[in-house]
Curated annotation (Swiss-Prot):
Its EC number is 3.5.3.23. Homodimer. This is N-succinylarginine dihydrolase. Signal peptide: none annotated. GO terms for molecular function: N-succinylarginine dihydrolase activity.
Length: 445
């Protein structure tokens, strides 16, 4: 049996826009109200996904959310025709309309937490959609996310799907952006790292003062229980609250791991050495490569601006590891110098590949945000909805679909355009047929 890690990237939706919705996310906030290019954004994401497939990686795509989300606008009291609802919301509650048009589901690192069958008690691959309760615009995603995941991983013999955690701040859960799995080989039992920003039930525990901590210890522990993980293969690490206050809203902005490598910034965690000792002890006899980036070489500001740690580390078919980085890392002198040095240090990371994902970066997410990691074996891969897996035919078809349905310019004011509803629903209805997803959206019910 073969084992590997698949990446399922979020397909950028037709309403990709810069509304500046995410307090604590420096890039999102600083680009608020800029004019976006949904067509370019979608094509940049598809190009990155296809490039990884061409490298020999298993690569899938996850469908975007339905936006504008008129179902939520109706839930909060707006009524009338679709056009009337948009018009009323734009006039009476523009911030709520922007939230209901969010493009953030493209960042599937926040879609769910995934535990592979090698780690779980029942030997199934487990998925729990993130509840994303800290941000209104993301808190409306989990039900549809669950539908899309169930339509993608649609075999109960191999996959177990859980409901998202209770919608309360005590269980704030941001998905795989705060979860890393280390292992010797993808088919071996690994060590699952859950990184949290605060303890909801302990008012005396450290927490940030300026920006919110979006992941709680209690949420991480609940997911470990749901997924049937043992104490022997879980480690809980506290994020450094000071770096959260400097714009590190998720752990994947300050650390990233793959197999026996944890690549992290010097200031990423609290109680670092004790926690790393625990990781190594639970990992076993093989060595974990803890690759620390010193503050003296890369500041927190440069790490956040460039998204040095919001890169993907992948294991190529050759066995070498490579970093998939945004071109922003090339454009930052300190970060580019560090990455050039990194590949000479004798670690498992041997190369860096750069991709232009600026439309995503300007909205606050880099290459790692765009993908959900799923370690699996070939039997499980055969049980996945094959129409969601990247190949030449799907790449061609999805690019043609984007050309047909997406605008190349979208401002925040355009979100009130009733035509956008028709365009978006027409596109998504066709997409569910391309990817054979069935009726996953509210408008299809």
């Amino acid at each position: 049996m073969k084992h590997f890690e698949a990446n399922f990237d979020g397909l950028v939706g037709p309403t990709h826009n810069y509304a500046g919705l995410s307090f604590g996310n420096v890039a999102s906030f600083s680009n608020a109200s800029a004019v976006s290019d949904p067509k370019s954004a979608a094509k940049q994401g598809l190009k990155k996904a296809k490039a990884l497939a061409d490298m020999g990686m298993v690569q899938g795509m996850l469908a975007p959310q339905e936006r504008p989300d008129l179902h939520t606008l109706r839930r909060i009291g707006f009524s009338g025709t679709d056009a009337e609802i948009l018009n009323k919301a734009a006039k009476e509650a523009p911030a709520l309309l922007r939230a209901c048009c969010s493009a953030s589901s493209m960042w599937t690192a926040n879609a769910a937490t995934v535990s592979p069958s090698a780690d779980t008690q029942d030997g199934k691959l487990h998925f729990t959609p993130a509840n994303l309760v800290d941000k209104l615009h993301r808190s409306i995603e989990p039900v549809t996310t669950g539908n899309i995941l169930a339509a993608t991983f649609n075999n109960s013999r191999h996959f177990s799907h859980h409901q998202h955690l209770p919608e309360h701040s005590s269980f704030g859960d941001e998905g795989a952006a705060n979860h890393t799995r280390l292992c010797e080989n993808y088919g071996n039992a690994g060590v699952e790292l859950f990184v949290y920003g605060q303890e909801a039930t302990n008012p005396n525990a450290p927490k940030p003062q300026k920006y919110p901590a979006r992941q709680t210890l209690e949420a991480s522990q609940a997911i470990a229980r749901l997924h049937g993980l043992s104490e022997e293969n879980t480690v809980y690490l506290s994020q450094n609250p000071d770096v959260i206050d400097q714009g590190v809203f998720h752990n994947d902005v300050i650390a990233v791991g793959n197999q026996n490598v944890l690549f992290y910034h010097q200031q990423a965690f609290l109680d670092t050495q004790n926690k790393f000792d625990e990781i190594q002890q639970k990992f076993g006899d093989s060595k974990v490569h803890f690759i620390e980036v010193p503050t003296a070489k890369v500041s927190i500001e440069d790490a956040v601006k460039s998204y040095l740690f919001n890169t993907q580390i992948i294991t190529l078919p050759s066995g070498e590891m490579a970093i998939i980085a945004p071109t922003n890392c090339q454009e930052n002198p300190a970060v580019f110098a560090y990455l050039n040095e990194l590949v000479t240090l004798g670690t498992p990371i041997k190369q860096v590949n750069y991709f232009d994902v600026k439309q995503s970066m300007q909205n606050g997410g880099g290459p790692a945000c765009l993908r959900l990691r799923v370690a699996m074996n070939d039997m499980e891969l055969a049980a996945v909805n094959q129409n969601t897996l990247m190949n030449d035919a799907l790449f061609t078809r999805l690019n043609a679909w984007v050309d047909k349905h997406y605008r190349d310019r979208l401002s925040v004011d355009d979100l009130a355009d009733p035509q956008l509803i028709i365009e978006s629903r027409t596109a998504l209805d066709e997409l569910t047929q391309i990817m054979k997803l069935g009726s996953v959206y509210q408008f299809q019910k």
